[in-house]
């Protein structure tokens, strides 16, 4: 686009303004609405920003391939423009959609401005749905576990050299980096309680052993942040978002992320039931028995590593 994406008072924290948005939506999406509405959305912990763009008048809206009128969409604003069409988010998005896995459609990418125009998958995350309909908690989590097994099965066995996830993994070095990051930024900085050299050495030895055990596991495609805030609940289906850091790792990694979620409390009995359900689906999908003792051990070790990393 030739229109400068200059922000104005109506678009706080955006690198674009009303003129840019009006011209872009008309040229790319054929929107004819007199008034375009833009609201900033609550994002994740990253430097990305999110905006919902909609029009009040839906006459003459653009039709996508499925002939569904696009009445609203999401703009994902990168921390800063990256002059590359194939950023990790887009490569992984294309890969997931090629496997018929639920991920938002990418309509347009303004490379110079670092703005991605994405399908609007609604306002309800799995977390929202769980709190709104607590009576459906078991059914909703079973749905999330089913999607996880489907994602792991399809993505693990469909290796694509263009997908960045296959070029990175949870090895000992990566797992220990996350552990040391927690020590430096949580224990030392946030708690202001730096460990002495001896205590840090002892703790490091314990975690090295734990990380070596985890790293021996068979590698699966992992979302890396598969939890209730990164699953949108859109018209009865769950949709994957925030998957740009996907990598190879133990199958338990995403299951721990889901069932040991810091945003939603799950009763221990339901956790056990869902682990059993996951193992049953996994055995059915792969056609072989799971070593349950080993599986549970890695699940527990992964729970320690994952939750310390997340503090």
Describe the function of each predicted region.
Residues 21, 25-31, 156-168, 173, ...:
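An alpha-helical support segment within catalytic cores of ATP-dependent transferases
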Residues 27-36, 99-101:
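Short secondary-structure junctions
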Residues 36-51:
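ATP-binding glycine-rich phosphate-binding loop
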Residues 47-54, 151, 207-255, 262-265:
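Active-site acidic catalytic loop and adjacent metal/ATP-binding pocket
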Residues 51-60, 64-177, 181:
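ATP-binding pocket architecture of kinase catalytic cores
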Residues 74, 102, 116, 220, ...:
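Protein kinase-like catalytic core scaffold
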Residues 180-190, 251-288, 301-310:
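Active-site activation/catalytic loop segments of kinase-like enzymes and analogous catalytic loops
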């Amino acid at each position: 686009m030739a229109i400068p994406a200059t922000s104005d008072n109506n678009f706080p924290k955006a690198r674009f303004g009303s003129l840019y948005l009006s011209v872009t939506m008309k040229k790319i999406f054929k929107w004819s609405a007199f008034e375009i509405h833009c609201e900033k959305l609550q994002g994740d912990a990253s430097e990305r920003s999110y905006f919902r763009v909609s029009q009040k008048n839906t006459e003459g809206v653009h039709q996508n391939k499925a002939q569904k009128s696009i009445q609203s969409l999401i703009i994902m604003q990168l921390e800063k423009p990256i002059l590359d069409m194939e950023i990790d988010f887009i490569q992984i998005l294309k890969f997931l959609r090629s496997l018929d896995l639920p991920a938002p459609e990418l309509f347009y990418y303004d490379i110079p401005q670092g703005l991605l125009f994405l399908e609007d998958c609604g306002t309800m995350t799995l977390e929202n749905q769980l709190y709104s309909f607590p009576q459906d908690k078991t059914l909703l989590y079973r749905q999330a576990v089913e999607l996880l097994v489907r994602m792991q099965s399809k993505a693990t066995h469909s290796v694509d050299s263009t997908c960045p996830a296959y070029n990175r993994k949870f090895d000992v070095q990566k797992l220990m980096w996350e552990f040391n990051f927690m020590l430096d930024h949580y224990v030392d900085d946030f708690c202001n309680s730096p460990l002495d050299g001896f205590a840090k050495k002892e703790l490091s030895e314990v975690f090295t052993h734990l990380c070596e055990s985890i790293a021996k596991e068979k590698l699966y495609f992992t979302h890396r942040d598969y939890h209730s805030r990164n699953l949108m609940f859109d018209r009865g289906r769950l949709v994957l978002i925030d998957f740009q850091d996907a990598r190879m790792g133990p199958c338990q990694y995403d299951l721990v992320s889901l069932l040991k979620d810091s945003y939603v409390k799950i009763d221990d009995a339901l956790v056990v039931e869902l682990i059993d359900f996951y193992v049953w689906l996994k055995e059915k999908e792969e056609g072989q028995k799971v070593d349950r003792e080993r599986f549970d051990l890695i699940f527990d070790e992964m729970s320690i590593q994952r939750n310390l990393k997340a503090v």
